[in-house]
């Protein structure tokens, strides 16, 4: 149950952001249809141009492809900015439970992202039925998909915001999660190829088949930043729906369990510090090792890259994970 008073407080706090975001998301889809129609009319009015055709083609995306950016901004304002400014304490002192606070923030921001896009989808559908283009390509799949993908991006940022203590930590954690499958699979595979001088794809055929199936791309959130998913089957959208649910549960549980709001730390749960530092150093070692080998094509370059990566990884992890940030 979302308390009405808390909902009003959260709305007033960011009402201009919500209104501007809602208008932008609502207008993007109808604007795309109308812009195509205007281009078609200009073609008809120009005698020098022939073969004019009114087509609505979303196969390569549209301005709505960047709706996930709005999701990121809203999530940062709802959690990361409040933690960085230290205003979360005042919110927690109000007569509401932590669960009610998170639910209100999450579903208010989610509604601002989903509802305007749904209205824009309906308005664009109405325009298409009135203007009658000769062909429409991937309109429904793209429009529904962007609602799902922008909500997934929002849920990811809310989860990272519930785990971390300031804006930079929220954004860096979310970005790391988006590319984590590539880091966990791609970097070790590349290092194996360097050390043992063989092709991982040739030695392990199931890995090659996995990559060729394109599932490797779509189980990572960053795979939906590009427009390749549009050309896949509609069932591909089940993956971001499941990821949205997982991110929501992580964010909800994290917000309930981690009570320190003003400690300025990267992670609110300090038990994450050491494992994350080890991962950062490991990724830096593997990444710089492969880079060193690629530049010199020698094992000396590979070993030099490993040493350099270990040093860089240590300092990056120390100054991001362990060093406390100051509040605004």
Each language-model region and where it sits:
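Long, hydrophobic alpha-helical segments
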Residues: 58-81
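Short alpha-helical transmembrane interface motifs in multi-pass membrane proteins
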Residues: 59, 69-72, 137-142, 235-236
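Alpha-helical transmembrane segments of multi-pass membrane proteins
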Residues: 25-38, 121
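Helix-loop-helix units of permease transmembrane domains in multi-pass membrane transporters
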Residues: 78-114
């Amino acid at each position: 149950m979302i308390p009405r008073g808390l909902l009003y407080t959260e709305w007033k706090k960011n009402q201009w952001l919500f209104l501007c975001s809602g208008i932008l998301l609502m207008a993007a889809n109808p604007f795309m249809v109308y812009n195509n129609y205007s281009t078609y009319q200009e073609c008809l009015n120009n005698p020098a141009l022939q073969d004019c055709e009114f087509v609505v083609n979303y196969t390569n995306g549209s301005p709505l492809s960047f709706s996930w950016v709005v999701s990121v901004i809203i999530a940062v304002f709802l959690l990361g900015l409040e933690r960085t400014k230290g205003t979360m304490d005042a919110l927690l002192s109000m007569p509401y439970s932590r669960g009610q606070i998170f639910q209100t923030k999450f579903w208010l921001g989610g509604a601002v992202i989903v509802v305007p896009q749904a209205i824009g989808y309906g308005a664009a559908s109405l325009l298409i039925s009135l203007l009658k283009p000769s062909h429409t390509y991937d309109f429904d799949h793209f429009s529904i998909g962007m609602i799902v993908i922008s909500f997934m991006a929002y849920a990811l940022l809310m989860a990272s915001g519930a785990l971390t203590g300031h804006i930079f930590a929220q954004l860096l954690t979310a970005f790391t999660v988006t590319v984590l499958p590539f880091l966990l699979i791609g970097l070790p595979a590349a290092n194996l190829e360097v050390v043992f001088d063989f092709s991982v794809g040739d030695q392990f055929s199931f890995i090659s088949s996995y990559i060729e199936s394109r599932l490797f791309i779509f189980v990572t959130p960053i795979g939906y930043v590009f427009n390749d998913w549009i050309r896949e089957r509609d069932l591909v959208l089940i993956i971001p729906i499941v990821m949205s649910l997982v991110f929501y549960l992580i964010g909800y549980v994290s917000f309930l369990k981690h009570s320190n709001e003003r400690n300025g730390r990267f992670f609110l749960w300090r038990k994450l510090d050491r494992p994350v530092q080890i991962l950062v150093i490991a990724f830096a070692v593997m990444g710089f090792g492969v880079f060193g080998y690629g530049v010199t094509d020698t094992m000396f370059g590979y070993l030099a890259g490993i040493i350099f990566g270990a040093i860089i990884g240590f300092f990056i992890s120390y100054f991001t994970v362990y060093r406390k940030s100051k509040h605004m």
